[in-house]
Structures are given as C-alpha cells and as structure tokens.
Amino acid sequence: MGKKCSSKFRQMLVLVLLLIVFTCLSVTAPLSVTAKPTSFKVKARGIEDEGQERTHSLNSKKSSRSVEKTHHSEGRRLSNVFPNAGIRAGPSKSGQGGGRIPVAAS
C-alpha cells in the first residue's frame, strides 16, 4: 500500500510541475511571426489620427500600400516575360497543319 501512494504522489507531482512549466512558457512566449498583435495602428504617410487615416486613404489616388503592391507585381511580371513567345509556331491542335502565318497571293 505504501508503494501505491508514493507512485500516485510522484505522478501528481510530475503533473503539477508540468502544468507550472507549461503555464510559465506560454505566458513568456513571444508572438509568432504570423500572429497579429491584439491592437495595432496603421500609419498612412505619418498621419496618426484614425479618422484622418480613413479620409486620407479614400481621397488619395493610391495609398502607399497599393503602390508597393504595384511595384512588387511589376517586378514579378518582368521576370516572367519571354521575348519571343509570340513568334513560336508549334503544331496545330486542330489538325489543320502547322502554325504558319498564311501569305496572301499576289
């Protein structure tokens, strides 16, 4: 009977220690990279008031964020451009022959 009590006591002690360690780690753990903070404020070109931020972004032609996206997508598009893509003529899928450009008879 004495061994049963000591083994249960050890199990309970281990569980309590694990619980304490887990709670300490979860409280002190930093936010992950993908997690958003609970409260954050977006500044649009240095304006700090929220009401002014909205009107400023609605009145401006492009917000700084949309300009960043445009530049980013342009760079991506330029890296995928094939200069001779329109000149290549492969086999026809319709069965009418090769992809040649017909020349008008004179």
From Swiss-Prot:
Protein's name according to its UniProt entry: Serine rich endogenous peptide 7
GO biological process, alphabetically ordered: response to herbivore; response to insect; response to wounding
Chief localization: membrane
Lineage, broadest ranks: Eukaryota, Viridiplantae, Streptophyta, Embryophyta, Tracheophyta
Tissue expression summary: Mostly expressed in roots, and, to a lower extent, in seedlings shoots.
Annotated stretches, region: Disordered: 46-106
Motif SxS motif essential for MIK2 binding per UniProt: ranges: 64-66, 92-94
Position of sequence motif SCOOP motif 1: 58-72
GO molecular function, one term: LRR domain binding
Biased composition (Basic and acidic residues): 46-56, 65-77
Family as reported in the entry's similarity comment: Belongs to the serine rich endogenous peptide (SCOOP) phytocytokine family.
Alphabetical keyword list: Apoplast, Cell membrane, Cleavage on pair of basic residues, Membrane, Secreted, Signal
Tagged with keyword Secreted: yes
Signal peptide range in chain numbering: 1-26
GO CC terms in record: apoplast; plasma membrane
UniProt superkingdom: Eukaryota
Organism: Arabidopsis thaliana (Mouse-ear cress)
Intracellular or extracellular location(s): Cell membrane; Secreted, Extracellular space, Apoplast
Sequence motif SCOOP motif 2, location on chain: 86-100
